[in-house]
A protein has these predicted regions:
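Conserved catalytic-core motifs of GNAT/GCN5-like acyltransferases
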Residues: 103-105, 123-138
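Conserved GNAT acetyl-CoA-binding A-motif
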Residues: 94, 99-112
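Conserved GNAT-fold acetyl-CoA-binding loop/helix
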Residues: 16-47
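Conserved beta-strand in the GNAT
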Residues: 53, 59-68, 72-79
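A short beta-loop-alpha structural element at the N-terminal edge
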Residues: 1-16
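Conserved acetyl-CoA pyrophosphate-binding loop and the N-cap/start of the following alpha-helix
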Residues: 54, 83-96
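A short helix-loop-beta-strand connector motif used in the catalytic cores of GNAT acetyltransferases and
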Residues: 42-53, 74
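A short, internal acetyl-CoA/4′-phosphopantetheine-binding micro-motif in the GNAT/acyltransferase core
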Residues: 76-86, 106-108
Length: 142
C-alpha cells in the first residue's frame, strides 16, 4: 500500500522503522553516517520518493521507496523493522514495486542486503567510496 506521508501517524511510523532499520545497517557496515538515519520528520515528509508499506499485527513492518527515472525504478530505501526480520517482508515490498528495470545501492559490507538483491536477480554494476573506509555497491536488474 502507498504510504501517505501527509498523515502524521504514518509519517512517524515510517520514521521510527527507518531509524531502527538503518541503525542495524550502521552496525553491520561500521558507519553511522547513513543519511536517512539522521533525517528529521520534516525532511522525510519533504522527500520526493514514493513509499510503499507493509503492515503486520504490530504496525508498520517495512517500507520501500522509489523514484521513476523514465522506465527505471530507482529504489531509494528498503527498511524492515528489526522485529520483522527473516519473514519475507523485504521480498514482498520489492514485489510491490512497479514493473521495469530496477537499480539500487547498498553498503558494500551489508551482506544480508547484498544477498537479498542477488537472490532476486540483481547484478553488481560498480562500487563507489562515499567516505573513508565506507563504500556503496550499485546493483541493477533488467
Amino acid at each position: 500500500m502507498i504510504l501517505d506521508l501527509s498523515d502524521g501517524t504514518v509519517l512517524h511510523e515510517l520514521w521510527t522503522v527507518q531509524r531502527l532499520a538503518y541503525a542495524v545497517e550502521a552496525e553491520l557496515i561500521g558507519f553511522d553516517g547513513i543519511p536517512p538515519l539522521h533525517e528529521s520528520l520534516d525532511e522525510l515528509r519533504a522527500c520526493d520518493e514514493t513509499f510503499l508499506g507493509l503492515y503486520d499485527e504490530e504496525g508498520l513492518a517495512g517500507a520501500v521507496s522509489y523514484r521513476l527515472d523514465g522506465s527505471t525504478v530507482d529504489i531509494c530505501r528498503l527498511v524492515v523493522h528489526p522485529r520483522a526480520h527473516r519473514r519475507g517482508i523485504a521480498s514482498k515490498l520489492l514485489d510491490a514495486l512497479p514493473d521495469g528495470p530496477q537499480v539500487v545501492s547498498t553498503g558494500t559490507r551489508n551482506e544480508p542486503a547484498l544477498a537479498l538483491y542477488r537472490k532476486r536477480g540483481f547484478v553488481e554494476t560498480g562500487t563507489r567510496e562515499v567516505g573513508p573506509g565506507v563504500s556503496l555497491t550499485d546493483l541493477a536488474k533488467q
